[in-house]
Amino acid sequence: MELLQLRNATVKLSYGGTTFLIDPMLSKKGTLDPFPSLRGDERNPLNDLPIPVEEILNGVDVVIVTHSHIDHWDDAAAQAVPKDMPIIVQDQFDADVVTASGFKDVRILDGEARIGQVTLNRAEGQHYDSPGLVPLLEEVTGTAATMGVVLRTDGEPTVYFTGDTVWFEGLETALRNFAPQVIVANTGGNSTPLGRLLLDDAEVVRISRAAPEAT
């Protein structure tokens, strides 16, 4: 297994003979509007990509989009990723978003799927700690839904990408059911006046205690 965190939630993972690109946000630094948060008017992305987009895409077999918010699937990704690339998404809303950009092989992960020698399992996510955030997310981004993804293959550790979530029953269930050995958690506790969007420090500790053997 080779895992390269590129920026934010964007990760390139070579695993079980397949190379995955997870949540590609490929825009140049500062070219996207600020996201709704207590950080105010910081433009996104906050940092440059560490390597060229061409190098990021080199060798990629499949793209996984945990949800279609712009920091996980942006116009730059839609333009750069080949249109025949398989794209794994969470639901019909996100499938429609990706298909609208011309992609021809968009697959909804509803439970379990097989990619080569790798088994993908959907894990539920909850992108808010207060139901009051749902209308805001839907108004600004089109959706409040998100998912996590668990990857398994022979001879490699089980890997769990939490996606954008807070601690809730679904996350705890994924830890219990899949017993991941590697956990890639989207953290930072990002908040709006209506509530929190991501795992905070205390919840990361909670994950660590729930899965003490995991990295």
Predicted region positions:
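Cap/insert and terminal regions of metallo-dependent hydrolase folds
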Residues: V166-T215
